[in-house]
Amino acid sequence: MSMGSFGFALAVMVLAVLVASAAGAPNTNFVSSACNTKKIPSGNPFFNNLGALLVNLEKNTAFSGYDYKASRAGSGGAPTAYGRGVCKQSISQSDCTACLTNLGGRIWGICKNAIGARVQLTDCFIRYEQYSI
């Protein structure tokens, strides 16, 4: 391999490493939480509303300016669930979605069925409540 070919190959490898590291997974390290002390009673239909709301936040925040509010109307006499998803502007849309999906799966364990919660990971944030936010 000539020196010119070697230099070109080296430049391509360095560029590939830089692109791969820039497109890495989101940082889902736990930062903080605030959980309402009131709990959702077992079997309450609010769980279904809240579950649908979290999926909505996970799927739409990245495509709504990285700061998205939504609500899920109550069914079966349950209160409406209100929520907000936020991602750092510096991450990709796919990393935003991945971060919120990760957080959506962890929020139950962090806040133990609380009727309201705010949980921050390094790259994303979810808040949900039983009142408009």
Curated annotation (Swiss-Prot):
Keywords: Antibiotic, Antimicrobial, Disulfide bond, Fungicide, Lectin, Mannose-binding, Plant defense, Signal
UniProt keyword Signal, yes or no: yes
Function text: Exerts antifungal activity through its carbohydrate-binding specificity.
Any GO CC annotation of this UniProt entry: plasmodesma
Residues of the Gnk2-homologous domain: 28-133
Residue positions binding alpha-D-mannopyranose: 36, 118, 129
Disulfide cross-links: 35-111, 87-96, 99-124
Species this protein is from: Picea sitchensis
Keyword Glycosyltransferase: no
Protein name as it appears in the record: Antifungal protein ginkbilobin-like protein 1
Stored PROSITE patterns: GNK2 (PS51473)
Biological process according to GO: defense response to bacterium; defense response to fungus; killing of cells of another organism
Gene Ontology molecular functions: D-mannose binding
Transmembrane residue ranges: none
Stretch forming the signal peptide: 1-24
Xref: InterPro entries: Cell2Cell_Antifungal, GNK2, GNK2_sf
